[in-house]
C-alpha cells in the first residue's frame, strides 16, 4: 500500500527519470460515492485548521484563496501553483489513493525545487467537499473555485449526487467572496446544461459572457492542465466551459 511520506524521506513508487510518483501505483475507481459514510477527520470550524501542516512556508498574512474541488491527480492544481505563486491553492479529493498521489507529487516537486520556494503554495486534502467545505473556509474567504470534469452521475436517481445543485450552490456562495469566480468544465453536454441551469437559477451567481470568459488568463489552462482534460483532448472530445461570478 502506498502511503504519504514526509518531505525529508525518500518517496516510494517514484520514477527514476522524473523523480515524481507514478500513477500506476495509485490506481483507484474513477469516482467515489459522495453520500457514503467515509471516515474523515475534519475541523469543527475554519479556525481549527492547521494550515501550516500543509503549507510549511505559509506567512501569517496568507490564507487559502483558490480551491480545486475534486482535484483528481493534481495536474491543474500544480498549474495553479505555477501561475499564481503568491496565491495559496488547495486541492480537495475524496479518493484516498488519488489524494495520496497528489500529496506525494507535491512533496516530490518541492524536493526537486528545493531552495526556490516553488510549490510551497499548493497542497491537497482528502475530504468530502460536498459535506465539509464550511468546516475549512470562513465566509467570503475564497477568490476562485474550480469544478473541472466532475462525475456526471448519468442515472437520474443519482443526479442528487452531482457536485452542482441548489443546496450546495448556497454553501459555495457562503465561502466565496463577492466578485469571486466559479469555473466549470466538462466533456458531458447534459451535465454542462445542468450546471448552467442551476447556476442561472441561483440568485447569487451570474454567468460571464463569452468574451469575458475567454479573456480570463486561466481559461486556456482549463482544457488540458488536468489529467482528465488532457484525456479529453487526446480523444478529441468536446469541452463545455462556463464561468460564474459571485454577486
Swiss-Prot record:
Residues reported in the UniProt entry to bind S-adenosyl-L-methionine: 70, 93-94, 128-129, 148, 226-228
Annotated localization: Nucleus
Originating organism: Drosophila persimilis (Fruit fly)
Protein known as: tRNA (guanine-N(7)-)-methyltransferase
GO molecular function terms noted in the UniProt entry: tRNA (guanine(46)-N7)-methyltransferase activity; tRNA binding
GO cellular component: nucleus; tRNA methyltransferase complex
InterPro entries: SAM-dependent_MTases_sf, Trm8_euk, tRNA_(Gua-N-7)_MeTrfase_Trmb
Protein role: Catalyzes the formation of N(7)-methylguanine at position 46 (m7G46) in tRNA.
Amino acid at each position: 500500500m502506498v502511503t504519504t511520506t514526509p518531505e525529508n524521506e525518500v518517496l516510494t513508487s517514484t520514477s527514476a527519470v522524473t523523480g515524481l510518483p507514478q500513477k500506476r501505483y495509485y490506481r483507484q475507481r474513477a469516482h467515489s460515492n459522495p453520500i457514503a459514510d467515509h471516515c474523515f477527520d475534519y475541523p469543527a470550524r475554519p479556525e481549527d485548521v492547521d494550515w501550516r501542516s500543509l503549507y510549511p512556508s505559509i506567512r501569517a498574512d496568507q490564507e487559502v484563496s483558490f480551491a480545486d474541488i475534486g482535484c483528481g491527480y493534481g495536474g491543474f492544481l500544480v498549474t495553479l501553483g505555477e501561475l499564481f505563486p503568491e496565491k495559496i491553492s488547495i486541492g480537495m479529493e475524496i479518493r484516498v489513493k488519488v489524494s495520496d498521489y497528489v500529496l506525494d507529487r507535491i512533496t516530490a516537486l518541492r524536493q526537486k525545487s528545493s531552495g526556490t520556494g516553488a510549490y510551497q503554495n499548493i497542497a491537497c486534502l482528502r475530504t468530502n467537499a460536498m459535506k465539509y467545505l464550511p468546516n475549512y473556509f470562513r465566509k467570503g474567504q475564497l477568490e476562485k473555485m474550480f469544478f473541472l470534469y466532475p462525475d456526471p452521475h448519468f442515472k437520474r436517481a443519482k443526479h442528487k449526487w452531482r457536485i452542482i445543485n441548489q443546496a450546495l450552490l448556497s454553501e459555495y456562495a457562503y465561502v466565496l467572496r463577492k466578485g469571486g469566480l466559479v469555473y466549470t468544465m466538462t466533456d458531458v453536454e447534459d451535465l454542462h446544461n445542468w450546471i448552467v441551469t442551476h447556476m442561472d437559477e441561483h440568485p447569487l451567481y451570474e454567468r460571464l459572457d463569452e468574451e469575458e470568459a475567454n479573456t480570463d488568463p486561466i481559461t486556456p489552462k482549463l482544457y488540458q492542465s488536468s489529467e482528465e482534460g488532457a484525456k479529453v483532448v487526446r480523444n478529441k472530445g468536446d469541452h463545455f466551459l462556463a464561468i460564474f461570478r459571485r454577486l
